[in-house]
């Protein structure tokens, strides 16, 4: 299979997030919905968004409450694009590696990392950093790509053509065990979707078909809420109850 170089750019993600494809739009809005439900934001809270990108999720956070938001991303281009959002030229966002966050222990009330851990080779080290900078009693919200998803294998095969692209799929039970071992008391799992949030477009072939969006979306949301362990992206939310032990 021929490989092509892949780069994370604001244009790529904005094109995906704000696509005319109804399934991509649904996925993007579903992510915002889950973030706000799980984070339960309140005025005055210090909130860290790891992997803030060009600001799609960030804008939903800013609108939800008067929070003290901080964002980090490994891409300077993403940060520049985020600061082009009206009234956000001075947004406290900076370049940082998720496995070496530039914050003291227990700095934040809430820590969010969605759509990121699956693209980090050292995802366990990054997860430990998320917990480290969260205060005891604070809330962590993060997500993984699900190895139990029906789409896990075809997506892996498709992404093999992208040189330099990292995408890990994890089992929810294993990741849950990891978080518990780091001192996170978890709530129920949530899922983005099973089929409606992973649209396939290869040439003229599209699945699921756009003409069936309304029916597919309604059925898929019901199924993902009932069986989140089959969702393509699984979301975890929990409270930090102890400081993790680092050997």
Residue locations for each model-derived region?
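Class I SAM-dependent methyltransferase SAM/SAH-binding core
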Residues: 54-100
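Short catalytic micro-motifs in class I SAM-dependent methyltransferases
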Residues: 115-119
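A C-terminal cap/extension of S-adenosyl-L-methionine-dependent methyltransferases
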Residues: 155, 188-247
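Short alpha-helix
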Residues: 167-183
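A short glycine-rich, Lys/Arg-flanked "PGG" loop and its adjoining helix->strand segment in the class I
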Residues: 124-136
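Conserved class I S-adenosyl-L-methionine
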Residues: 1-40, 56-60, 78, 141-166
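A conserved beta-strand element that flanks and buttresses the S-adenosyl-L-methionine
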Residues: 112
């Amino acid at each position: 299979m021929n490989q092509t170089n892949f780069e994370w750019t604001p244009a790529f993600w904005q094109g995906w997030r704000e696509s005319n494809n109804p399934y991509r739009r649904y996925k993007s809005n579903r992510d915002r919905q889950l973030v706000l439900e799980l984070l339960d934001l309140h005025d005055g809270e210090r909130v860290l968004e790891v992997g803030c990108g060009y600001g799609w999720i960030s804008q939903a956070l800013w609108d939800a409450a008067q929070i003290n938001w901080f964002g980090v991303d490994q891409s300077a281009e993403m940060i520049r694009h985020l600061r082009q959002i009206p009234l956000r030229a001075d947004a406290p966002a900076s370049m940082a590696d998720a496995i070496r966050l530039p914050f003291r222990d227990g700095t934040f009330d809430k820590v969010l990392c969605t759509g990121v851990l699956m693209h980090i080779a050292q995802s366990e080290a990054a997860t430990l950093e998320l917990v480290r900078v969260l205060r005891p009693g604070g809330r962590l919200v993060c997500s993984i790509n699900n190895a139990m998803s029906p789409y896990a294998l075809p997506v892996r095969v498709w992404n093999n053509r992208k040189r330099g692209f990292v995408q890990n799929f994890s089992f929810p039970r294993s990741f849950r065990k990891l978080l518990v071992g780091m001192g996170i008391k978890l709530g129920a799992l949530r899922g983005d979707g099973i089929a409606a949030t992973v649209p396939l477009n290869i040439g003229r072939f599209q699945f699921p078909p756009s003409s069936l969006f309304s029916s597919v979306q309604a059925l898929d949301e019901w199924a993902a809420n009932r069986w989140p362990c089959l969702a393509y992206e699984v979301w975890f939310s929990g409270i930090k109850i102890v400081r993790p032990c680092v050997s």
